[in-house]
Amino acid sequence: MIDDRGVSHQYATSEAHVVWNNPSRAPYHTHLPMIHFSRRFASVVVFALVFPCFAVAGVLPVGLHCESAGNPLGIDAQHPNLSWLIETSGTNPSPRGVKQTAYQILVAGVWDSGKVASDQSQNVGYGGKPLVSGQRYDWKVRVWDNSGNVSEWSKPATWTMGMLKPEDWTARWISTQAGAAKTGGKLTILKAVYKARDGAATADVTAKVSLLVKNGVLDIEVGSGILGGDPALNHVKDLAVEYELNGARGSTSAGDFERLAIPKSLLSGTDAPYVRKTFDLTAIPTSALATVNVMGFYELYVNGKKVGPNILGPALTNYGKRSLYETYDLVPYLRKGRNCFGLWLSRGWRDSPIARMQLDMMVGSRPLRIATDGEWRCKSSGRTILGPWQWNNMGGELVDARQDDPRWADPLTSDSDWSPVSEIAAPAIPAEAQKCPPMRVLKTIPAIACTKRADGNYQLDFGTQLTGWLKLRLRGQAAGNTITIEYADKLEPLQTFSQLDRYICAGKPAEEFCSKFNYHGFRWAIIKGLATAPVLADAEAELIGADFETRGGFTCSSEQLNRMHQVNLWTIQCLSQSGFLSDCPHRERLGYGDGQVSIESCMMNFMMQPFYSKWSTDWVDGADPNTGYMPHTAPNGPGGGGPAWGGAGQALTWRNYLYYQDTRIVERNLDACRRHIEAIETHAKDGVVRAFGGQWDFIGDWVPPERGMDTNNWPPKPAAEFFNNCYRLYLREQWAQMAEVLGRQDEAKAMRTELARLQPLVHAAFYDKDKQFYVLDEQSYYLMSLMTGVVPEELRPAIMKKLEECIRVTRKGHLDTGMLGTYFLMNYLMEIGRNDLLWLIVTQKDYPGWGYMLEKGATTWWEQWNGHWSQIHSCFTSLDAWFYQGLAGIRPDTAKPGFKHVIVKPAVVGDLTWVKCHHDSPYGRIISNWKREGQQLTMEVTIPPNTTATVHVPAKVDGAVTESGKPAAEAKGVKFLRMEHGAAVYAVGSGFYQFQSILPETIR
């Protein structure tokens, strides 16, 4: 073919393809050979590629991503989105106003886009030949800039397809529960004795145990509760059972908190079993992709080694609608000869784990597949999940270290005495590639203090609230000694939420306890069963959460605000487990609609696109199939809430589009979001929705001050009705904006027409003319009426004045809002430029407010302003967005989403003297720094290539504004637009800018 410069080059067009050598490729890919193959085909044809370039230095595409990830393994998008950044070079500072005008993408063997005239460098859809399951694709891109220069080709990147069709799977679903053997046959309990080990007391419990036999199976956790009483309080006891099973006599025993099962080979749903398969290889494979599809939790092992750092995977889904699979490159783990593939399973949110896995390899020229079936073997690991994973009882783990087998996944270990797994029917749901980031250990935290409590137990303090687990090294413990660990987020009163682990010692000179398949929210660990205090250096906690890519940074002259920023980040990390943001990690662990209040805070700090895309799907999956009403929690539940909680599905959809410019999420969810709106409308009479459902189905603003769970002084019913009516109007406008994105203009117009009809009806139903407010003289109700257009135009100044009086006078600079009210208050005041009011609110140090929490020693945000109940909660995590979008002023533009056009509108408020902030947008790093000295302001702004910006420079007059030492109006690439609310507004292209101005006397 001939390219646009008249240069001839060869290009491969066969199904097979060539891999470019890329030394910078991610570690999982460095081992792959130059000649690649499809794992669906045994033969390979290789073609040569020659791409001569005569490029002009200046721009270069870098940071190539496919489906928002670098070199992803196992994607399932048939037309994946490809993205890149534009890097400038050759001059310092970098040139201004750099834009891409065209691009060309080459995907080896399957697609040459040709030169495409477009400035799009994000979410470019693949347009080549149909993609093949298991195939690796190599791609590169070059771009043309607005000076007519063509770049060098980018360094190559890759993506690897996952399973695209159900028929790609040959692996069978397996379970470690004994299937047909679950009916044990004829089991008779001959004698059962519950006795103290020291002989202090003995009880005959034969009758009790006999009643616990179900379908020929006895499967219990030994304890006084299930056995009818405690014959020897505070003494260690055993249950000894003699039985007859199918005519054969036997005996068994187990201690308190241990599991006793007859038949002995039976594994329960609460077990965390080992599952394995051995196989032989004649040579090390040139490629080996493992695809693991588990409902529950798992860890993957090959030849005794854990594969990768991921934990507690996969992410949780609605198991009635879909499951997730993950893909691994196993070449570094395999060897010639005998190999062993192992899965360590646990139930997670399921009653018991089920799994399927297949490993596709190329050994020499021969394809080979290992897949789960009934020939795989399993046994107990000695780990059992404690607790029912229910409200206020998420439990923990029982670890019997005497059963620990560190060589369970070693190929030389015999599994002849292991039990066979059971093949089970395949769930009638699709399996999809996991797109959200995996969970990992994010930080190790040493214990800072150990004290002996009045009850004789030992208390470890880690100095901060966290979500994770304890690592405790034990020395000189007798075999069978049981250590119990409780976890608390508050000491006065002690608040554990039934979180506990039990560890039965193996009796080794040194051993270590650490959870694997459950976690806790805590600051303190209380240890029972130790004769002497633990050594402080032997105790660590590990923070666990989603391994988000960091996308932002903020610091300023106020140490109080810097602390708030760090606490906000830490709180979000403490809530980021299992593919959704939970309300709290200990009491409920549910994906409540609370998560919508932290959307902007999360997106400014982290890469959230795949995470929120997945979570928005969970809301759609959970919608009522008859009405379309979205649940209050997703993907797990149920939980209490109201129309606003189900609205989280739409909020996630819209913000994901606004921040990342991907229309696919809107296409997927728009109709489901409309059904949710329509479901709310079924409860309307005369244009006003009235309370429906029970107490926990129509909540308005959750836990404002003095209206929390400790007082039961909930807002009156009309307040919840007004709040939810306003929220339903908010959903309508947001939905109309999404419909416009897809070109559904008529539907958007119809939605707004109905919105305009409803606004005066809601006003008439709730406005008190005499008192001049809606329902209550509280900030949430002024705010919601203003934000949603319920207030008639002629009343807006008066209602805004009442809101300001409520903040400044009635509440003396404090807020009186709850979770949703706080979120909307911050967004609304920032939108209308009242950052002075936000500064007043945020910098308060007494109750209620974030400063009050800090003064009381909070290391994560609480559920209620006064600290009642949960100490790690999502309610007030909306704060951080103001630091980025208010103080630094970095905001997306709805007209050009994904930060294709940037708004920089900083707030110079209070006694703040400087701000340093950046956000790594899809197009590159945006920087907004400012410093004031008296009334002199210096702003430094960086806008990434291929974008434009509107920059608001706080200034007394535009004529006094300079840029890089010149009058701003004369500076290259700077265009004055207008004066607006005490700021000179400029249009700029990419590049670095330094503005200086004289601040107005009054600034907001």
Walk through the language-model features, giving the residues of each.
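Alpha-helical support elements that line or immediately flank enzyme active sites
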Residues: 288-297, 302, 469-487, 517, ...
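Bacterial N-terminal signal peptides
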Residues: 42-53
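Extracellular, modular beta-sheet/disulfide-rich ectodomains of secreted and cell-surface proteins
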Residues: 183-268
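Non-catalytic C-terminal accessory modules of carbohydrate-active enzymes
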Residues: 358, 375-377, 381-407, 432-443, ...
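Active-site acid/base region of carbohydrate-active enzymes
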Residues: 297, 356, 363, 367, ...
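C-terminal capping/lid segments that line or modulate ligand- or cofactor-binding pockets
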Residues: 395-402, 587, 605, 649-650, ...
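Extracellular/oxidizing-compartment recognition motifs
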Residues: 59-185, 268-586, 594, 610-611, ...
